[in-house]
Amino acid sequence: MLRHMHRSGVQPFRQRLLPWVQSIAVPRSNRVQPSAIRHVRSWSNIPFITVPLSRAHGKPFAHRSELKHAKRIVVKLGSAVVTRGDECGLALGRLASIVEQVSVLQNQGREMMLVTSGAVAFGKQRLRHEILLSQSVRQALHSGQNHLKEMAIPVLEARACAAAGQSGLMALYEAMFTQYSICAAQILVTNLDFHDEQKRRNLNGTLHELLRMNIVPIVNTNDAVVPPAEPNSDLQGVNVISVKDNDSLAARLAVEMKTDLLIVLSDVEGLFDSPPGSDDAKLIDIFYPGDQQSVTFGTKSRVGLGGMEAKVKAALWALQGGTSVVIANGTHPKVSGHVITDIVEGKKVGTFFSEVKPAGPTVEQQGEMARSGGRMLATLEPEQRAEIINHLADLLTDQREEILLANKKDLEEAEGRLASPLLKRLSLSTSKLNSLAIGLRQIAASSQESVGRVLRRTRIAKNLELEQVTVPIGVLLVIFESRPDCLPQVAALAIASGNGLLLKGGKEAAHSNRILHLLTQEALSIHGVKEAIQLVNTREEVEDLCRLDKIIDLIIPRGSSQLVRDIQKAAKGIPVMGHSEGICHMYVDSEASVDKVTRLVRDSKCEYPAACNALETLLIHRDLLRTPLFDQIIDMLRVEQVKIHAGPKFASYLTFSPSEVKSLRTEYGDLEVCIEVVDSVQEAIDHIHKYGSSHTDVIVTENEKTAEFFLQHVDSACVFWNASTRFSDGYRFGLGAEVGISTSRIHARGPVGLEGLLTTKWLLRGQDHVVSDFSEHGSLKYLHENLPVPQRNFS
C-alpha cells in the first residue's frame, strides 16, 4: 500500500485534517499546533548546508567519525520512543524533535527513510474515544475515566488498533514534515512483500523513486493483516532475516536499499554488557560481532514486539549486509533532542556496530586502569613516587633528540594551519626540556610530604581519635591544546599526588605527546604502575569525555578561553578547574618609578605574549599623560612592535589616536595591548573588577599605602606590586610545576601545583564506641581535644 502526500493542496488538506487528528487522538492540553513546530533554521544547531556525500554502498563504516559521510539513512523508531508512558497515544514532543532532525539531514542532501511504530497506540486512543462516545451518559458517569481504561484496553485487539491508527499517524507525520517543506509517503509491508520476488522489485522501485523525488518514505509493518512471523531462511542462496517486528523490518529495508546507516532508537542508551539497571552494567561504545559472548540480554521493553536481543540480531544482520548500525536512546530528554544528528556527526552516542575490532582499550577502560593505577601510586612510599618523577626528568634530557624530532614533525604538519601564538606553544626546545626537568625534580622533592599527610588530630573521647589526612582526588582528565610540555608537568604532579590521569592532547601535537607519554610510562614501570597515566586517543571528542562522570573526578583544561568555556558547558556533572580567560591588567600609578615601569610593561607584554599571564590591558593614571614616562612607555611598545588599542577615555585625550578598542574585555594572546586612562587607584580597581578575569593584576607605584590598598581590594587569584604579570606561574612560585591556573572561588586558586590535586579524608579509630554511649545517661563524654600533628621525617 502506498499513500503519497503531494505538495499541491497540502495546506488546505492539512487544515481540514489536523483538527480531526487532534480532536480524536490528542487531549486538548497536549495538542500540537503547527506554529509550535519551529523551523529548522531557527531551532536546530546543525548547520543548514549541503554536505559532500559521494559514498558508494559497500563495506560498513569502520569508525564513528566516518558516519558524517552517510548519504542514505534509515531511522527506526521503537514503540517506546513513539508512544507515551501510558502506551495509549503518541509522545508528540519526541516525534516533533525526530521529524525536525530527519528534516535537517534530508535538507543537507541525504536520503532519509523512517521505520516507525505507533499505529497501535494511536488507534488504541482513538478506539477508546469511540467507546466513550458510544456509552450513554449514565454509563459514562458510572464507569469513570479510570474504570473505562481498565475495561477498554483488554478488549482492544492490536490489529484493529493498527487499522484505526494508521491514517491518524500518517496525518500527524504529514503535518510535521510540512513545516519543513518536505513531503512524506507511507508504505505498509509484510514479510510476504520481501519473499515474493515481484513484490520485492516493486517495493524497491517505489522506494528508489520516492528518494529520487526527495520524499521521505515512512515504512511500517501492516499490523492489521500481518501474518505470523516466519523463521529466518535462505532466499536464492542468500541468508535473509524474517520480518518479525520493526527491528527486523528496518534491518531488512536497510540492506535491501543498500543503506549507509541504520539508526535504531529505543528507550535505553544502547547495548550494555548486562541487563540495564544491574549494578555492573556498562554501556558498550563499539560492538564487534566477535564479542557477542560477553553480552547478557534482559527482558524486552515495556511496549513493542522486540527486545534488545532482537535489536542486536537485526543490527548484526544489517552490518553483515554492508550497513553501519547505531542503537541509541530516543527518549532521554537531555539527549533525544539531537540524538539523530549527533550520531551522524560522529558523536559518541549509543552503541556503534563495527566489523573492525576496536584497537586498544576504550576510554572507559582507560579510566578504570587509571583509577586502579592511581590507587597503587597512592600506596607507594613517598621515596618511590619521587624516584619515578626523577627518572622521568632524566628521560627528558637523555631522550632529547627523539623528543625534538617528534616535535619537528608536529611543527611541519601544523605550518600554515595554526596561528603564530599556537605554533609558539607547540614548539619544544632544548632549553624548554631542561626547564621541564628542573621543575620535575622540584616536584619530586616536594612529593614526599603530599599523600597521607596528617592535617589535624582530635581526641573525640577516651580511646576515640580522629585524623584528617591528605588523599588523591581520584582520576583527573587534563585536556590541553598545542602544549606538549604540559604533558610531563601534569604527569609528574599526578604521580606525586597519587592520582590516576587521563591526558587528551590536540591532534596538532600528536607525535610529541606520543613519545612523551611513552617516556612517562617507562618511568612509571620501575615500580609497576605503568597504567596510572593514559593518553586518550585523538579520535575521542572532548564533549564525550566530559560526560564520563562515573569515571572522571576532576577536569583541568589547558588551552584557549573558548576551549575552557566549551568544557565548562559540557561537563555538567564533573568539576572543572581552570580559567576561561587571562585578561591581566597593570595599573601605572601617578607615583610610579620611571625606571621600573618600562621594564615591567615590556616583560609582562613582550616576553611571551601568547601566555595566559601576559599583560592585556595597561591602565595609566591621568596625571601621567603627556609626561616623559608616558612617552617612554609608548616608544618602548612601538620598538617591540606592539599594536596599541585605545580605550574610550584614552582615545578622547588624543587628537590622532589608534583605533578605539571594540571591547575592554579582550585577551589578545599576541603583541597587542589596550591602553586606558583612569583617575585614581579606586577607578583602576573598579575597571579590573568590571573587565578583568580574576587572573593576575599588577600595580606599579612607589607609594606603599596605595600599593597595599590595591593588593587588599583587587579580587583576583594573583595580585602583585611592582612585579611582572609573568610571575603568575607554578614554577616561578616554587611549586615545581603547575597543572593550570584557576580563577574559581573554591578549592585551589591561582597557579595550581601539587596541593591543588589533593583532597582529604577522615580516619576515626575507636574501641567499640557507639553514639548511645554519649547520650544524656551514657557513660562517655565528648572531649574534642586538639592533638599534636606528627611530623614525618623525610631526611
Curated annotation (Swiss-Prot):
<dbReference type="GO" id="GO:0008652">
    <property type="term" value="P:amino acid biosynthetic process"/>
</dbReference>
<dbReference type="InterPro" id="IPR016161">
    <property type="entry name" value="Ald_DH/histidinol_DH"/>
</dbReference>
<dbReference type="InterPro" id="IPR001057">
    <property type="entry name" value="Glu/AcGlu_kinase"/>
</dbReference>
<dbReference type="GO" id="GO:0006536">
    <property type="term" value="P:glutamate metabolic process"/>
</dbReference>
<feature type="modified residue" description="N6-succinyllysine">
    <location>
        <position position="550"/>
    </location>
</feature>
<protein>
    <recommendedName>
        <fullName>Delta-1-pyrroline-5-carboxylate synthase</fullName>
        <ecNumber>2.7.2.11</ecNumber>
        <ecNumber>1.2.1.41</ecNumber>
    </recommendedName>
</protein>
<feature type="binding site">
    <location>
        <position position="117"/>
    </location>
    <ligand>
        <name>substrate</name>
    </ligand>
</feature>
<dbReference type="InterPro" id="IPR016163">
    <property type="entry name" value="Ald_DH_C"/>
</dbReference>
<dbReference type="Pfam" id="PF00171">
    <property type="entry name" value="Aldedh"/>
</dbReference>
<dbReference type="InterPro" id="IPR041744">
    <property type="entry name" value="G5K_ProBA"/>
</dbReference>
<dbReference type="GO" id="GO:0006561">
    <property type="term" value="P:proline biosynthetic process"/>
</dbReference>
<dbReference type="InterPro" id="IPR000965">
    <property type="entry name" value="GPR_dom"/>
</dbReference>
<feature type="region of interest" description="Gamma-glutamyl phosphate reductase">
    <location>
        <begin position="362"/>
        <end position="795"/>
    </location>
</feature>
<dbReference type="InterPro" id="IPR016162">
    <property type="entry name" value="Ald_DH_N"/>
</dbReference>
<dbReference type="GO" id="GO:0004350">
    <property type="term" value="F:glutamate-5-semialdehyde dehydrogenase activity"/>
</dbReference>
<keyword id="KW-0496">Mitochondrion</keyword>
<keyword id="KW-0067">ATP-binding</keyword>
<dbReference type="GO" id="GO:0006592">
    <property type="term" value="P:ornithine biosynthetic process"/>
</dbReference>
<keyword id="KW-0808">Transferase</keyword>
<dbReference type="GO" id="GO:0005759">
    <property type="term" value="C:mitochondrial matrix"/>
</dbReference>
<dbReference type="GO" id="GO:0019240">
    <property type="term" value="P:citrulline biosynthetic process"/>
</dbReference>
<feature type="binding site">
    <location>
        <begin position="266"/>
        <end position="267"/>
    </location>
    <ligand>
        <name>ATP</name>
    </ligand>
</feature>
<dbReference type="GO" id="GO:0004349">
    <property type="term" value="F:glutamate 5-kinase activity"/>
</dbReference>
<dbReference type="InterPro" id="IPR019797">
    <property type="entry name" value="Glutamate_5-kinase_CS"/>
</dbReference>
<feature type="region of interest" description="Glutamate 5-kinase">
    <location>
        <begin position="1"/>
        <end position="361"/>
    </location>
</feature>
<keyword id="KW-0521">NADP</keyword>
<dbReference type="Pfam" id="PF00696">
    <property type="entry name" value="AA_kinase"/>
</dbReference>
<dbReference type="GO" id="GO:0005524">
    <property type="term" value="F:ATP binding"/>
</dbReference>
<dbReference type="GO" id="GO:0005739">
    <property type="term" value="C:mitochondrion"/>
</dbReference>
<keyword id="KW-0418">Kinase</keyword>
<keyword id="KW-0560">Oxidoreductase</keyword>
<feature type="binding site">
    <location>
        <begin position="305"/>
        <end position="311"/>
    </location>
    <ligand>
        <name>ATP</name>
    </ligand>
</feature>
<feature type="binding site">
    <location>
        <position position="246"/>
    </location>
    <ligand>
        <name>substrate</name>
    </ligand>
</feature>
<dbReference type="InterPro" id="IPR005766">
    <property type="entry name" value="P5_carboxy_syn"/>
</dbReference>
<dbReference type="GO" id="GO:0009266">
    <property type="term" value="P:response to temperature stimulus"/>
</dbReference>
<comment type="pathway">
    <text>Amino-acid biosynthesis; L-proline biosynthesis; L-glutamate 5-semialdehyde from L-glutamate: step 1/2.</text>
</comment>
<comment type="similarity">
    <text>In the C-terminal section; belongs to the gamma-glutamyl phosphate reductase family.</text>
</comment>
<feature type="modified residue" description="N6-succinyllysine">
    <location>
        <position position="311"/>
    </location>
</feature>
<comment type="pathway">
    <text>Amino-acid biosynthesis; L-proline biosynthesis; L-glutamate 5-semialdehyde from L-glutamate: step 2/2.</text>
</comment>
<dbReference type="InterPro" id="IPR036393">
    <property type="entry name" value="AceGlu_kinase-like_sf"/>
</dbReference>
<feature type="modified residue" description="N6-succinyllysine">
    <location>
        <position position="347"/>
    </location>
</feature>
<dbReference type="InterPro" id="IPR005715">
    <property type="entry name" value="Glu_5kinase/COase_Synthase"/>
</dbReference>
